[in-house]
Amino acid sequence: MIQHEEIATPIGLTARLLDVAEVFAGVGVSREETVVRPGERLPVIGVRDLQDGAVAPREALDTVGFSSLSKAMTYAVQADDVLVTGRGTLLKFGLVGDETAGAIASANIIVVRPGTDVTGGALFAILSSDVFRPKIEVLRRGATTLLSLSPKDLAKLEINLPPLNEQQRIAALVKDAQIAYRTALEAAEIRRSLARRLIDARLFGDNQNH
């Protein structure tokens, strides 16, 4: 239940994350269960599925069997959700797109679901920023390099939220930046593959397949 204890400012409002978003951890599943667990198989998001601010699409995710579909769907992510790694060596963030919506968040993932008059793109920009990231880092606990983050601790952090129209501009910039980044990566991969073929042709000629 999202509460509303906000402090209005000329540039927006200051509020705890729990006042403007729903914050919860995903469902517990082990790697072994991705193979042997019975029930209807659903795509599950793990730590490795968060890369460069994006979340892997449903078809690229491991699937896990769930005996109770209704229970599993309470952990399904929605477009515009912000995902944060709750356990792992690295603190990672991801913004859920339509291609991932409906997948199930694992227990290693914290879901931050924006409330009314809040955009996920703006929340993602705030939480993953170089300014705010250290505030989350200090909340992570662990005796080794495998650190954990509590959803309750994360939810208590205060954020400065811009007005909605500015949030929408920020969200658009985030989306454009992610599209540009993915496009650049795809183009680089194509160039590398082409260069490899040309190099192999010069080195081995027609003998490269023999």
Feature locations, PLM:
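Non-catalytic DNA-recognition/assembly elements of restriction-modification systems
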Residues: 1-33, 39, 161-210
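Sequence-specific dsDNA recognition surfaces
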Residues: 18-33, 49-79
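Short, surface-exposed loop/turn microsegments at beta-strand edges and helix-strand junctions
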Residues: 34-42, 60-63, 75-77, 95-107
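A structural connector/turn signal
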Residues: 71-72, 99, 144
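Generic structural signal for buried aliphatic residues
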Residues: 81-84
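A short beta-sheet element
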Residues: 86-127
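A short glycine-rich beta-alpha junction/loop motif
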Residues: 103-108, 141-168
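Glycine- and charge-enriched low-complexity intrinsically disordered segments
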Residues: 120-144
